[in-house]
């Protein structure tokens, strides 16, 4: 049985990883999360009482607390997902992204290195530091049909992607300089249950159910590759347990869709699954409202996931159609979860005008 320290385990992808490990493996999890606005322990209700699960409310920028957690739990691996991740928010509040994504990653690397250096030789050899990143570090594919491979040059476009690119470089440098056994993964856009409603898909679902406008940036033709979060969680666990030290693995869903197509598909699913509409709404699609594009908005991201398929045998199980249907149905069935989220300070709107 491994003990895996997961940072950001109360976030969207992190909670999916924690649920996957507790539900489908014999490994134990130590969840380290600061619990910012997007961290939600209600996403972990099913594992909260499991003896293989522990939670520590710790900020990765707090080195002393990280040292305590490593000493107390003595993990066999780290899966680093703690990050500020919303592009729109990074445009207006870049400092938070620099602090968490760069300084926080540095602190975690140093705490992990100090812990790793004093491990017994057998555990020392088996230890892994898995850094979870994004395809946005590669920049924009523009109008081409190309895919980002693991060797694509970095060209981040936003404060968010620049901060993640910086953290990727730190992780690789700690392997090359100090020998810390690191692995990096870069993923495409995730979606699925428990997604915080500032992101495109849950925002559209909840606004539509409330009869509010569905704000779409620019002409809506920006293309993203969509990855169901539970498929991603499987891939991440496979990488931390089977991946090769020093390697990078791109993880994608092979589901390229224009944003406007995604929104229209959500509307069509809601017509079927939630036909009783809010007052004054004839069709959900009538709520679509085009708004000013955000600064530096990338036209297209898409990753080539051939390497992880070839080397580790991972494939996504969900198509975009099956995954989106499951997601819409989950939000319809879990009103209490998202109402509790919305009762906080968050308001359903698109951010990122830079004003």
From Swiss-Prot:
Cofactor (UniProt): NAD(+)
Residues that bind NAD(+): 12-13, 33-36, 59-60, 81-85, 100, 160-164, 190
* Cofactor annotation comment: Binds 1 NAD(+) per subunit.
Look up the EC number in the record and give it.
Answer: 4.2.1.46
Reaction catalysis annotation: dTDP-alpha-D-glucose = dTDP-4-dehydro-6-deoxy-alpha-D-glucose + H2O
- Indicate whether Iron appears among the record's keywords: no
For this UniProt record, the keywords arranged alphabetically read as follows: Lipopolysaccharide biosynthesis, Lyase, NAD
Where does this protein act, in terms of pathway? Answer: Carbohydrate biosynthesis; dTDP-L-rhamnose biosynthesis; Bacterial outer membrane biogenesis; LPS O-antigen biosynthesis
Q: Name one GO biological process term.
A: O antigen biosynthetic process
**Active-site annotation:** 135 (proton donor), 136 (proton acceptor), 160 (proton acceptor)
A Gene Ontology molecular function term for this protein is:
dTDP-glucose 4,6-dehydratase activity
Task: Identify the residues that bind substrate.
Answer: 85, 134, 189, 199-200, 215-217, 224, 259, 293-297
Superkingdom, according to UniProt? Bacteria
Q: Does the keyword Transit peptide apply?
A: no
A single Pfam family, by name? GDP_Man_Dehyd
Q: How does it assemble?
A: Homodimer.
Similarity field = Belongs to the NAD(P)-dependent epimerase/dehydratase family. dTDP-glucose dehydratase subfamily.
Write out the function statement from the record.
Answer: Catalyzes the dehydration of dTDP-D-glucose to form dTDP-6-deoxy-D-xylo-4-hexulose via a three-step process involving oxidation, dehydration and reduction.
This chain's protein is named: dTDP-glucose 4,6-dehydratase
Q: Which organism is it from?
A: Neisseria meningitidis serogroup B (strain ATCC BAA-335 / MC58)
């Amino acid at each position: 049985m491994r003990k895996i320290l997961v940072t950001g385990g109360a976030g969207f992808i992190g909670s999916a990883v924690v649920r996957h490990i507790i539900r489908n493996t014999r490994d134990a999890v130590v969840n380290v999360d600061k619990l910012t606005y997007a961290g939600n322990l209600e996403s972990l209700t099913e594992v909260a009482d499991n003896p293989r699960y522990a939670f520590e409310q710790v900020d990765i920028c707090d080195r002393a607390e990280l040292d305590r957690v490593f000493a107390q739990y003595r993990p066999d691996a780290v899966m680093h997902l703690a990050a500020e991740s919303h592009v729109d928010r990074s445009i207006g509040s870049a400092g938070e992204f620099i602090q968490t994504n760069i300084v926080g990653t540095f602190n975690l690397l140093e705490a992990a290195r100090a812990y790793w250096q004093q491990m017994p030789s057998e555990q020392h050899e088996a230890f892994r530091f898995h850094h979870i990143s994004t395809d946005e570090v590669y920049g924009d594919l523009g109008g081409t049909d190309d895919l980002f491979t693991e060797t694509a040059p970095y060209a981040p476009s936003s404060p968010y992607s620049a901060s993640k690119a910086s953290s990727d470089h730190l992780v690789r440098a700690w392997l090359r300089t100090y020998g810390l056994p690191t692995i990096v993964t870069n993923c495409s856009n995730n979606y699925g249950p428990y997604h915080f409603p500032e992101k495109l898909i849950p925002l559209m679902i909840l606004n539509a159910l409330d009869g509010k406008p569905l704000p779409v940036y620019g002409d809506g033709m920006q293309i993203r590759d969509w990855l169901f979060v539970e498929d991603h969680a499987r891939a991440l666990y496979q990488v931390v347990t089977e991946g090769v030290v020093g390697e990078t693995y791109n993880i994608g869903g092979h589901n390229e869709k224009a944003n406007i197509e995604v929104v229209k598909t959500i509307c069509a699913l809601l017509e079927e699954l939630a036909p009783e509409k809010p007052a004054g709404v004839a069709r959900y699609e009538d709520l679509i409202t085009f708004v000013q594009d955000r600064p530096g908005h990338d036209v297209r991201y898409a990753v080539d996931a051939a390497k992880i398929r070839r080397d580790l045998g991972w494939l996504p199980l969900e198509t975009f159609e099956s995954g989106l249907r499951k997601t819409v149905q989950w939000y319809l069935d879990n009103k209490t979860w998202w109402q509790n989220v919305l009762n906080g300070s968050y308001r359903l709107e698109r951010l990122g005008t830079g004003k």
